[in-house]
Amino acid sequence: MEGTEAAAAKPAGGSPQGPKTGSGTASPVEGTSAVEWSGPEPQLDNGHPPRPWPCPQENRTSSLMAPQPPRVWGVQLQGPSVLESKVRALKEKMTVAKQGVSPCSASQEWSSPKKPQCRRGKAGRAGTPSEGSFLPGAVVAPRTQNLPDGQLDGSINEEQPARDGGPRLPRPPAPGREYCNRGSPWPPEAEWTLPDHDRGPLLGPSSLQQSPIHGVTPGRPGGPGHCNKIIHIPSPRTGRSYPFPDGVVTEADLDSTSLTSEEVFVPRTALLGERWRAGDLEALGAGSSVLSLSDRVERNRLLLQEMLNVSGQSPRKVGTPAWTPSWDTAAPERPVGDVDWASGTSLQDSGQNRTVGPNPEPVLSPRHEEATHLLQRARMKARTRPLRASHDIVPTITQGSRDGHRSPARDPRTTPACRDSLQNGHTSDSSSGESSGGHRPRRGPSPSHVRFEDESAREAEFRHLERLQQRQRQVLSTVLQAADQGPLRSKPDLADYINGAPRLRDAGQGTFHRLVGSLDRRGHPAPPAPGSERRCQACGSCIDDPRPAQGKAPPVPRTLQELQAACGMERVLGGLSSPLRLLPAEPRLHMEWIRETHIGDTVCPAEVDSALDSTDNSDNCRTDSEEAGTSQAGWACGRTQGSSPRLRLRGSRPRGHRWSKKAEAELPWGLQAQQHLPRADDVEVENEVKEGRGHTPEGTLFLREDAKPPDLELKRVSLGPQWQPGPGLGSHQPHPLDSRTPCRTAYATTAPMTPESSGPGGQAQVTESHESLEIVSPSSLQQSHAEPSAPHQAWQPTASLCPEGWAPTPPPSRKTTSPVSHRKAALAGLLRLGDQTEPVGIPRPPSRSAVLRTCELPPSQTQPSRPQVRHPLLALSTNNCNNSAPRGLQEPYGGAVHEGRVERGPCSREPEPPLENSRDGGPQGFLGSADVATINSTGITLSLSSEESESSKESEGSLQRTGSGSGGHVLSRASAGAGTGPGSPSAAPLDQNKKRSSSIASTLGLKKLFSALGQSSRPKLGKSRSYSVEQLQPAPPGLTSQSRAPSLQSLHPVSPSHQRRKAASFQNLHSLLSSKGNRSSLYLVAGPGDHSAAGRPAKTSPRRALSVEDVGAPSLARTVGRLVEVFPDGTSQLQLQRSPGGTFGFCVASGNGRPDSGMPSPLPQPHGWGGLSKQGRAFWLWSEAFLVFG
């Protein structure tokens, strides 16, 4: 045996440890480093051949190690990582299963740098770790079925003593269990800690002898690498002695029923600190009985090896919780050299190795814990690594997106793989699991995609895109800057680039004219007036500076601006190729700038509309803002309009239905208009003309763009001597130079005149406009035909323009949501008309057609609608822009537009006086009116029919005036009055009817149109803050003050239910209250005629839809009390005033449905609220109560 063992005990892997003793000693301690099993070794059921367990630091040899003073051997947990052990165990298991090695199979050598190889001989084999990794501290004890000592001894093979080289050790009686190493009795229940092998007391041979278990101490005494003594416990079944580390097996264990003939795992002492209970051992044995004998033997061997290895390899750790017999629970880790470790199979993994002990949760040995930790770490790493990778990727992408260098698409693109991770990780960092863990560092959407509470995803996306485009523009701006245009770093810069000509005009007509000189066709003599409007009233950005900058730049950037703006205009006028060419770059620039400009420039009513659009859609809002800004900017800044068409072309989304058609149909023209900033003026003028026909409000818009007439001139020059056709035009042309309104009027006139100058071209354009208008075009045609003379020609161009204006206007009506759309449409229409008049005119008609078809409002309809809409539009604009911007735009950009805004109540009329003032440029005044009408059309008011009638009459009168010869002037006027026109009364009525229907539809579905017609983004209109009640209220502060004393209905509107609905914030309540107050004024005071002031609020209120509170108020005649305070909990403190007559009943309803929640508490005379409390007693009520006071 010894020889066999010696052979088997070759140092594993050249283990430095050699056999400590050359020969076995007759010591009671068996001197075999390997466990010898008496009799043939049963093969494991699983087919794993018994594995020799190497002593960690010693090669186990058959020769007995020099007898070491017996020492308590402890199992040191020094296992490889759990994963490694599992892998090895699995491999081993597979190998064993395949080999099906018999117990007596040739000894298998396990080489371990630390562990000596042990071969199993026929006589015996070294115990090998079982497939399942065993707990380092667990010791396998053969199950002895509680045999008496004698029986136990007898059960041991007689050969045992011989092989052991010593007589079998007598076993102490079961009652007097002893540590095998100490020989101290170990009561079954007694808990004992195995002393660290280093410090463990050495067991005397006697103690070993006393123990039936033969132990071999193959290690150096106290040497951490030394293997603990192995105790051979005879197995009743196998007749072999199973080696166990000293102190592992106790008589109690052997005696214990749990120790049956089958081999069981004796819990190995995990660390010196581990505590064992005999009961645990017994339980373990009992549990092990479930396992097959071979499995148990294998496990026992493994445990012994493990223990020996551990004890030899690593010092025990004290205080480690003792390993519990539960094999499943314990995931024993074997030493790296351990075969089981190599196999990596843990006892847990072994299907048969299930909880052997009664205790399901064994105290894990330090080694087991370590393995568990390692495993967990490995898992975490596995999770973390990918996550880290994703995380790294994400930051890059996110950063790029933030920087805007990455397109929003790029983020999704780069992120996709990571995005899921990011979303999983970012959204659910740790919850997402392994993958999410790595992704969690990453953020979901990049900041560029961050959405504001009031913006939709689409808006956020647009905003992000705009940002990206802005970056691109910056690149372009760098180029432009090289050209002295300056970078497009700001709206003004973009405006300069986009509407460089208008800016130049604004900056200095001389400069612009010089630019125009090179771009005569553009015919964009920059009107100084627009220059004066350098600052966007909406955004406050100085358009003046940009324009002057452009004015400065024009000479140098004139190359770029001319190429882009000028060439855009020229080529747009001359051909669409250039505009299209510019459009790719400029649309981005324009769109971005326009949006921003609209945000800034949309001071004009168009801007208000733009604001509405903005309200509707952050993105579309911008686009709309761009449109509005374009119109307004066109009004306010010629460049804006020019840009607006581009924006429309490029930003069809915001302009959507209208601009998509117009811009697409007139894309070249839009490009032209955009490219040639004067074209923007032209657009404005055309818008004026369009609105002049449809409503010449845009003429008013054009008022601010004096350069427009020069643009028109240039356009007309390109189209032909169109300026000449109208006396108004000639005069207006100076007016454009002198005053925008005259210029625009002149332009509008010029547009009509253009047909004259352009002759068939203009008429053809007009015809196209009519075609586009279809419905409107008949009126337009009629109007045009009504004035076959020069005015008639002017009318035709006007009709062309008007259809365009109408077309844009109806889209606003359609879009009702945003006057910007109307403005855009008007601008687009005017530009189209201008372009139509010009070579680009042909494309314009299609655009008009699209626009007109979209609107399909007759000029007269459009006109009346516009004035009518003007009011609602003003209200809407007021809601969005509070009507302040439009007015501002009005002044700076165009009296007509601003007047139109001012005209909200008497919209058409107010603009008309300025228009009349502009009548010097007749069309201008008319255009102003038309512009207002156009805006009104956008905002379709409730008083459509009346205004339509007025518009019709005015249109007829104006048309007549236009026919009289001032053509442009009269036409503008007529357009302002009739929109399309007076030219053809029948057409005008038809248009009016259509317009009424459109207006009514717009009015009725104003909000819906805003949300629905407003492109998908537009629906945000309601959401936009510009539409917030507070903003709406500011417009009618007077009404609010009047209705400030809340009537019962007023209180009701502010009722807690409503408050809760709104989120009970005092500010919100005030806003609501104010709006309610407005409603109250509408109901109570609505009759009283603040129509100018109340008109908007009243219309606004209807738009808002009456609330039950409004309708349900029992009486509007008297205010019952006031809302004193709103509390965070949603309750309101009301101050009720008893009517002088005596008792009164009132119900304070709460939305939460808790009638008893309120508590009336009479308070001392409340701080008088405007005398509410002075009337009789004041009651302070909590709004959740239903109270009747008598």
UniProtKB/Swiss-Prot annotation:
Disulphides: none
A GO BP annotation: centrosome cycle
Region (Disordered): 1-77, 98-223, 313-366, 378-457, 613-663, 685-823, 831-850, 877-930, 942-999, 1015-1063, 1087-1106
One Gene Ontology term, aspect cellular component: nucleus
Compositional bias annotation for Low complexity: 425-434, 814-823
Superkingdom to which the source organism belongs: Eukaryota
InterPro entries, per the entry: DUF4685, PAR6_homolog
Record's compositionally biased regions (Basic and acidic residues): 402-413, 685-696, 703-716, 898-912
Biased composition (Basic residues): 378-388, 647-660
Compositionally biased residues, Polar residues: 102-111, 343-356, 747-757, 777-786, 1039-1052
Pfam families: DUF4685
PANTHER family linked to this entry: CDNA SEQUENCE BC034090, PAR-6-RELATED
Record's protein name: Uncharacterized protein KIAA1614
Source organism phylogeny: Eukaryota, Metazoa, Chordata, Craniata, Vertebrata
